[in-house]
């Protein structure tokens, strides 16, 4: 990643210094495994440190993203009971469609941003970001409208019990509004990964996970909104993450972190045929692969 002054860790440090200064459990675990392999002569020590510094923020980001379902299920289970747990579980695969679409086309984003970043071509990066956002919105907004309009009919396809289907429908009806934001957030994360920065998406997505927990606690336990409250917390958290990515991309910095590697002009072209074609050609196979897992969940 692009190591910036003031980051909580730096690559220039030697292994022993890094371990003493930074007691991050994820990083230490990866580093310990890597150093064991290095001692066996299977990998180079400097590659272990570099790979660890690049990968551990991605692992934390993934955990933050995946925490959404766990938090929703746990909290509605405590507040409402088993029917709510089952309902949220049945609605989960529909939410996964957002990740199939957003994550798939984000593969095109990371490829084009990486090319532009390596060539120091800011215009190319901006075009890739804008076109990727258009593609994801064009695909996820209709999906969100479908989920919001026919939640009971959709959940009833896989849920036999009426009470469970109704709980799932209540959840899906609200969480549908977060689908476009979830897709955009995957693109936002990949923008920075393509610019060799795994730290920024980790902070943003981690903050979103914390916001999700806090919002769920208010909506479920204080306002007694049940499964709809869990869905509302998820939507709010995703909106906050999207807003954070947008502001960071427009400003090119985050207060307290300093300058970021990517800054995007929002007034450029959005419908660039060549860029959209590239994103589709790169991302479509990934969408297909992701869809296989989503279908398996159904």
Predicted ranges, named:
Residues 2-55, 113-178, 220-283:
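Short alpha-helical transmembrane segments in multi-pass integral membrane proteins
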Residues 56-111, 175-182, 277-298:
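Transmembrane helix-bundle signature of multi-pass secondary active exporters and lipid flippases
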Residues 85-148, 182-201:
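Small-residue-rich hydrophobic transmembrane alpha-helices
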Residues 88-91, 95, 171-174, 201-204, ...:
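Hydrophobic positions within alpha-helical transmembrane segments
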Residues 60, 64, 72-76, 88, ...:
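Hydrophobic/aromatic residues within transmembrane alpha-helices of membrane transport systems
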Residues 63, 67, 71, 101, ...:
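Generic alpha-helical transmembrane segments of integral inner-membrane proteins
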Residues 81-82, 161, 196-198, 226:
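Short loop-to-helix capping motifs
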């Amino acid at each position: 990643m692009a190591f910036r002054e003031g980051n909580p860790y730096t690559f220039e440090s030697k292994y022993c210094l890094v371990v003493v200064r930074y007691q991050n459990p994820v990083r230490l675990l990866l580093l310990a495994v890597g150093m064991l392999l290095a001692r066996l002569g299977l990998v180079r020590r400097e590659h272990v440190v570099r790979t660890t510094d690049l990968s551990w923020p991605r692992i934390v980001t993934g955990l933050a993203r995946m925490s959404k379902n766990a938090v929703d299920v746990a909290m509605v289970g405590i507040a409402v009971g088993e029917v709510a747990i089952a309902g949220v579980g049945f609605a989960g695969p529909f939410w996964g469609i957002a990740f199939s679409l957003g994550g798939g086309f984000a593969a095109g984003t990371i490829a084009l941003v990486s090319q532009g970043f390596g060539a120091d071509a800011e215009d190319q990066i901006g075009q890739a970001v804008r076109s990727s956002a258009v593609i994801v919105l064009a695909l996820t907004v209709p999906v969100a409208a479908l989920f919001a309009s026919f939640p009971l009919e959709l959940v009833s396809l896989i849920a036999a019990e009426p009470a469970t289907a109704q709980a799932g429908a209540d959840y899906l009806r609200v969480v549908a509004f977060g689908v476009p934001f979830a897709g955009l957030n995957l693109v936002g994360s990949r923008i920075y990964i393509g610019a060799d920065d795994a730290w920024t998406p980790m902070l943003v997505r981690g903050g979103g996970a914390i916001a999700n927990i806090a919002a769920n606690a208010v909506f479920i336990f204080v306002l007694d909104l049940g499964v709809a409250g869990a869905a509302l917390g998820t939507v709010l958290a995703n909106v906050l993450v999207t807003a954070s990515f947008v502001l960071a991309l427009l400003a090119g910095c985050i207060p307290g972190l300093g300058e970021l590697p990517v800054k995007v002009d929002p007034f450029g072209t959005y419908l660039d045929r060549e860029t959209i074609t590239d994103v589709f050609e790169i991302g479509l196979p990934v969408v297909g692969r992701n869809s296989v897992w989503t279908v398996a969940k159904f």
